[in-house]
Curated annotation (Swiss-Prot):
<dbReference type="InterPro" id="IPR016327">
    <property type="entry name" value="Alpha-defensin"/>
</dbReference>
<dbReference type="GO" id="GO:0005615">
    <property type="term" value="C:extracellular space"/>
</dbReference>
<dbReference type="InterPro" id="IPR006081">
    <property type="entry name" value="Alpha-defensin_C"/>
</dbReference>
<comment type="function">
    <text>Probably contributes to the antimicrobial barrier function of the small bowel mucosa.</text>
</comment>
<keyword id="KW-0044">Antibiotic</keyword>
<keyword id="KW-0211">Defensin</keyword>
<feature type="region of interest" description="Disordered">
    <location>
        <begin position="1"/>
        <end position="43"/>
    </location>
</feature>
<keyword id="KW-0732">Signal</keyword>
<keyword id="KW-0964">Secreted</keyword>
<feature type="disulfide bond">
    <location>
        <begin position="53"/>
        <end position="81"/>
    </location>
</feature>
<keyword id="KW-0929">Antimicrobial</keyword>
<feature type="disulfide bond">
    <location>
        <begin position="55"/>
        <end position="70"/>
    </location>
</feature>
<dbReference type="GO" id="GO:0042742">
    <property type="term" value="P:defense response to bacterium"/>
</dbReference>
<dbReference type="Pfam" id="PF00879">
    <property type="entry name" value="Defensin_propep"/>
</dbReference>
<dbReference type="InterPro" id="IPR002366">
    <property type="entry name" value="Alpha-defensin_N"/>
</dbReference>
<dbReference type="InterPro" id="IPR006080">
    <property type="entry name" value="Beta/alpha-defensin_C"/>
</dbReference>
<feature type="propeptide">
    <location>
        <begin position="9"/>
        <end position="47"/>
    </location>
</feature>
Length: 82
């Protein structure tokens, strides 16, 4: 069993993402996800660095998969990543 601790920080969308995807609203928040030590670990490969995740109230959208949960205050959200 391998467990990840997800540290979520708000990120800014690029112009390309903004044009092609729905803007995160009140119920969706973009977050950056980092795994392990900031200096780098065996878990922090290229594929993990490019992971984009959202905290969503109602579940994941197309091309996203559930990667766990995230918390804002006392509310619990679904962590959806692509």
């Amino acid at each position: 069993l391998l467990a990840f601790q997800v540290q979520a920080d708000p990120i800014q969308n690029t112009d390309e993402e903004t044009k092609t995807e729905e803007q995160p609203g009140e119920e969706d928040q973009a977050v950056s996800v980092s795994f392990g030590d900031p200096e780098g670990t065996s878990l922090q490969e290229e594929s993990l660095r490019d992971l984009v995740c959202y905290c969503r109230k109602r579940g994941c959208k197309r091309r996203e998969h559930m990667n766990g949960t995230c918390r804002k205050g006392h509310l619990l959200y679904t962590l959806c990543c692509r």
